[in-house]
Each structure stands twice: as C-alpha cells, then as structure tokens.
C-alpha cells in the first residue's frame, strides 16, 4: 500500500500548497484555503498508510515521490515543462528514496 499512499499524499500536499500559493501569490479568493486545508489534512493522513518502521523514514522516502509529483503538477497544471535540471534532480531524489525504502536493515 506504500506507493498508492505516497501518490495520494503527494496529490493532497501539492493541491493544498497550491491553494495557498493561489491565494498569496496569485491573489485568489480566500475560499481557496478551505479545500487547501482539507487537502493538507488528507496528505498527512495518507502517510499513515505507508509501510515503514518509523515515521521519519516514511517521510524521507516520500520526498522523492513528492518531488517527481510536483514536476508533473508543474507540467500538467501550470503548463511549465520541466527542464533537464528538473529531471536530473528528480532522478537523484528518486534514487535516494529507493535507497531509503529498499536498503537492507539489520
């Protein structure tokens, strides 16, 4: 259940943060904050379904998924195509997340 939880968490976190961004940076209605708060709460709840021994490890591994999901959001929602540096950074983060998730534990 870890990957679906990570993906749901990413959607919740990105949508919630974008709602705040929309209000503060783009001058959107403060009503955007209501779904933003709900989205951020859903993000936090989703991470409780990650199969990990410690919350910190789950959060650290999630970081790679969050970064990749943020770039997909940027491309599909905001219409800004990621460049090679975005892709390189995301690949490095996913590699780090894979080490955290799949590394041998004694």
Curated annotation (Swiss-Prot):
Could you identify this protein by its name? Answer: UPF0060 membrane protein Xaut_1380
Question: Transmembrane segments in this chain: where?
Answer: 4-24, 30-50, 58-78, 84-104
Its Gene Ontology cellular component terms are: plasma membrane
PANTHER family attached here? UPF0060 MEMBRANE PROTEIN YNFA
Where would you find this protein in the cell? Cell inner membrane
* InterPro entries per the UniProt record, alphabetical: UPF0060
Species per Swiss-Prot/TrEMBL record: Xanthobacter autotrophicus (strain ATCC BAA-1158 / Py2)
Q: Which HAMAP family match?
A: UPF0060 (MF_00010)
Q: How does it sit in the membrane?
A: Multi-pass membrane protein
Predominant place of localization:
membrane
Has the keyword Cell membrane been applied to this entry? yes
The record's similarity note reads: Belongs to the UPF0060 family.
Alphabetized, the UniProt keywords read:
Cell inner membrane, Cell membrane, Membrane, Transmembrane, Transmembrane helix
């Amino acid at each position: 259940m870890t990957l679906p939880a990570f993906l749901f968490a990413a959607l919740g976190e990105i949508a919630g943060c974008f709602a705040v961004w929309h209000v503060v940076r783009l001058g959107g209605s403060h009503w955007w904050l209501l779904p933003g708060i709900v989205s951020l709460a859903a993000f936090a709840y989703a991470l409780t379904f990650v199969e990990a021994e410690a919350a910190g490890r789950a959060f650290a591994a999630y970081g790679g998924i969050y970064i990749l999901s943020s770039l997909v959001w940027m491309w599909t929602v905001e219409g800004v195509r990621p460049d090679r540096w975005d892709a390189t950074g995301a690949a490095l983060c996913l590699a780090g997340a894979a080490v955290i998730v799949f590394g041998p534990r004694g």
